Amino acid sequence: MRKKRTLFIIIILITLIIGVLNSIRFKFLYEVLKLSNSLATISSDFYSEPIKDITYKDIIYKRNDGETLKFDLYINGEIKDPKPVIIYVFGNGWVYGDKVIPEAISSIIDLLKDEGFAVISTSYELMDDEVIFDKQISDVKDTIRWVYKNKDKYNFDVDNIGLIGPSAGAQLSMIAAFSDDDEFVGDVSLKEYPSKVKYIVDLFGPSDLSKINLSAGPSEIVDNFTAEDIESYSKLYSPINYIKEDLPDTLIIHSKKDNIVPYDTSVELYESGIELNNKFDFYTLENCTHYLENLSNKEALGLYMNIIDFILSESK
């Protein structure tokens, strides 16, 4: 009798958990459908239209040679539990862009905030006339270190920190997450803090710099990446060269028709990761370009659902 009672309680609990997860999915789907009249316009929104209700804007997290670096922090103040942290790292080819969260993923950010996440949209020093991968990676790692330093002030759950970034932001995020705590040290005041994260969402990031189609990217990238230097850059700053055991869980999303970052490089990254028993997941898009042009409504929903399911499952 007691065994049956215990089994019944377990079944009820499982049912409740599934119900909660499904309610989150439906809420997310509703938010996505509100995004615009057509999800096919997602590519044009990917670098514009900031989301509303910023909780803390322009927090200075470090100084680089006199230049202040800032991020925006979004928090649902009504939730008092320790907050999982998701850090958004923008793309734009390392040479331009800012921390404004694009409208295309604002529904994801709004949902996560509503579910109790602390969302950070960080910035990093942009390349001008020289390659500064070291600084950019240290900026991402220093954002993570800042979270550890301020965990009590903002009630962060530092056991549940994730990174999400498109393109160049994904490359910087992967190296920041795959490298050790004592690598890519920037601000000395943050040096003593860890840079460990639990998971990463890699949105079509270049995992092997030697295979990027530079001619299809911004002219500033071509100017910075000379033929003489590309080999050394590739060895030092390609995420594929940081693959080892016990890496953070990683969701890789890439299109077969990416015209700048070859799809096969993400396949290679995925295979290298799972070969060493890392938890790497892969979601393939069929027809869109690197800038998500030609992304169908169906694929957009699949893209969003995979991201949100992955983040929620990692943050239990």
Locate the predicted segments by residue.
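Short beta-strand/loop motif that positions the catalytic acidic residue
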Residues: 246, 251-254, 258
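N-terminal cap/lid segment of alpha/beta-hydrolase-fold proteins
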Residues: 35-81
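Short beta-strand element of the alpha/beta-hydrolase
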Residues: 82-93, 97
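Catalytic nucleophile-loop/oxyanion-hole region of alpha/beta-hydrolase
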Residues: 99-104, 108, 120-158, 295-302
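C-terminal catalytic histidine-bearing segment of alpha/beta-hydrolase fold enzymes
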Residues: 267-316
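Conserved alpha/beta-hydrolase "acid-adjacent" motif
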Residues: 259-268
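Mobile cap/lid helix-loop segments that gate and shape the active-site cleft of serine hydrolases
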Residues: 48, 205, 209-242
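Primarily recognizes the serine-hydrolase "nucleophile elbow" in alpha/beta-hydrolase
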Residues: 145-214
